[in-house]
Amino acid sequence: GSREVVQSGSTQSFYEFVEVAGGISWTAARTAAETKTFAGVNGYLATITSASENAFVASRIPNADNVWIGASDSTLEGDWRWGTGPEGQNGGTRFWYSEDGVVNGVQKNTSYSPPAQDQDCVATAAESVADGNPIRGSIDNNLVTYACWAPNEPNNFGSGEDAVVTNWSNSDGKWNDLPVTYSANIDGYVVEYSEWNGQTFSSSNVVKSSSSVSMGGPVLTA
């Protein structure tokens, strides 16, 4: 069948939503994403590192709930990292640290559940403390990068939740942590294609920031 692969003008990456009837686990989605190709470039579960990128991805999956993206804290509980694509190199890029405690005199976090007054989508840890609560999402006084958790997430509920979905429970662009083996109510996953690790888009039809290109099906840019 046809594919819809859409380019973001801000990241220059291409994105593809893969719907999976009956659900799919994060582990299986990660493997599946890395077997997909577009214009000669291998895919990976999307890494969302800015508000504009998050909004773009959310705009492409408005009718989908619980869609896997490339974040995990499977190595160290509460140490959330992008573990796929270019951000997944060298142990992954940390974007959030959500474990209680103090490191070198700096309060890392009050709890997994952020105070109701705090923003859930933050670009830096400083943005989450307008109400005077201790900084959450920081370690060794290094600010977090972008994150957009749903209220009271991540919470590592039950037996452990080490992977992330976007569009959690009808909340467009909001993230939640779930077990890596969870597949019920998962609508699919988002694949990102970008030029990294020596890979370049091979097709002359792929023109960055163009209005549209075609690769065996409808392929749009925005």
Predicted regions and their residues:
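Extracellular, disulfide-bonded carbohydrate-recognition/adhesion ectodomains
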Residues: G1-A222
